């Protein structure tokens, strides 16, 4: 099993690489790539951790050596948010970075599962899909926008509010991965109920949690450590599914039946070929139904921006 992390020298990439080095199955290969010259050193640093995960680092313009033979590619390359920016302000820089890296994936490991972390995810996933399509290698079951951070934040905030253990809570989060497009389905958590005001406040906090971190870091960065953890959780779920484990379910931003939008975050069953099944989002509360309808314009525009960028 070979996993490649692109953007491995950044805050998210290093946290993700550390978690993968300690948690990937024995005998796995972990390949780190970043344009930054420090990347081979990050790999050497991590290689001193005593786990049976083989690690190599590559830097420079060419990601090909890192991508050769990869089963899973996780992309965290790009610039981070600063105070006053929202995820869409990142588009101008990150769109080009994602296009370039996905072109290299299309040439080098076209059958790999691809997980996109680089923001704005609503748009960068659409860019990746169009690049793969142009190259004639697009498989909609193998491209994922990683929205797991919304899930783990939801689990944490609900547990805090209700005095529960966070590991016992799993909140499905649908829609997209920015602002109003993030919709936690709080009505679907077994055995937990909320007042109307709690739902409004929690939903808003989950939607704005990224900004909470950006502001708390006072210009020194965005959510890197929690995002690294979220990406590792999703990446390890992909590994387990590829190894034939059954019933691996995660929420992710994927191309589906287009009922709400071409790309939509929803619970998915993972299998040996990526998405095995897109699960129904279930019954929504009136609040959730309204929130879903309200987000679709924004989501459609985000997706179109990505499609137009490649065309």
From Swiss-Prot:
Gene Ontology biological process terms, A to Z: malate metabolic process; tricarboxylic acid cycle
Q: Name one GO cellular component term.
A: cytoplasm
- Mention any Pfam family matching this sequence: Ldh_1_C
Which keywords are on file for this protein? NAD, Oxidoreductase, Tricarboxylic acid cycle
Record's keyword annotation contains Oxidoreductase: yes
Please provide, alphabetically and separated by semicolons, the GO molecular function terms listed in this UniProt record: L-malate dehydrogenase (NAD+) activity
- Residues bound to NAD(+): 7-13, 34, 94, 117-119, 227
What are the catalytic residues? 177 (proton acceptor)
- UniProt keyword Oxidoreductase present: yes
Q: Which reaction does it catalyse?
A: (S)-malate + NAD(+) = oxaloacetate + NADH + H(+)
Assembly state and interactors?
A: Homodimer.
Q: Which PANTHER family match?
A: MALATE AND LACTATE DEHYDROGENASE, MALATE DEHYDROGENASE, MITOCHONDRIAL
User: Which family would the database say this protein is a member of?
Assistant: Belongs to the LDH/MDH superfamily. MDH type 1 family.
Q: Which NCBIfam families match?
A: MDH_euk_gproteo
By what name is this protein known?
A: Malate dehydrogenase
Q: Which organism is it from?
A: Yersinia enterocolitica serotype O:8 / biotype 1B (strain NCTC 13174 / 8081)
């Amino acid at each position: 099993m070979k996993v490649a992390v692109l953007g491995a020298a950044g805050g998210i990439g290093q946290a993700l690489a550390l978690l993968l080095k300690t948690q990937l199955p024995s005998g796995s290969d972990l390949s780190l790539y970043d344009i930054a010259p420090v990347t081979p050193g990050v790999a050497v640093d991590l290689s001193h951790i005593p786990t049976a995960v083989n690690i190599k680092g590559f830097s420079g313009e060419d990601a090909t050596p890192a991508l050769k033979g990869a089963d899973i590619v996780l992309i965290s390359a790009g610039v981070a948010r600063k105070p006053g920016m929202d995820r869409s302000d990142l588009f101008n820089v990150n769109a080009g970075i994602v296009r370039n890296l996905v072109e290299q994936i299309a040439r080098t490991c076209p059958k790999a599962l691809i997980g996109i972390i680089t923001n704005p995810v609503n748009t960068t996933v659409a860019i990746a899909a169009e690049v793969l399509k142009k190259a004639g290698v697009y498989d909609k079951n193998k491209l994922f926008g990683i929205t797991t951070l919304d899930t783990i934040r939801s689990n944490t905030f609900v547990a805090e509010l209700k005095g529960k253990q966070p590991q016992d809570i799993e909140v499905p989060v649908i829609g997209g991965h920015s602002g109003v497009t993030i919709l936690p389905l709080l009505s679907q958590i077994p055995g937990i109920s909320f007042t109307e005001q709690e739902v409004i406040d929690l939903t808003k906090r989950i939607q704005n949690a990224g900004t909470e971190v950006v502001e708390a870091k006072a210009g020194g960065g965005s959510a890197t450590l929690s995002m690294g953890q979220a990406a590792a959780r999703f990446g390890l779920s992909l590994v387990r599914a590829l190894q034939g484990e059954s019933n691996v379910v995660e929420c992710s931003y994927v191309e589906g039946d287009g009922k709400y939008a071409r790309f939509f975050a929803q619970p998915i069953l993972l299998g040996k070929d990526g998405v095995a099944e897109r699960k129904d989002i279930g019954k929504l509360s009136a609040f959730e139904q309204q929130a879903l309808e309200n987000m679709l314009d924004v989501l459609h525009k985000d997706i179109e921006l990505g499609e137009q960028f490649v065309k």
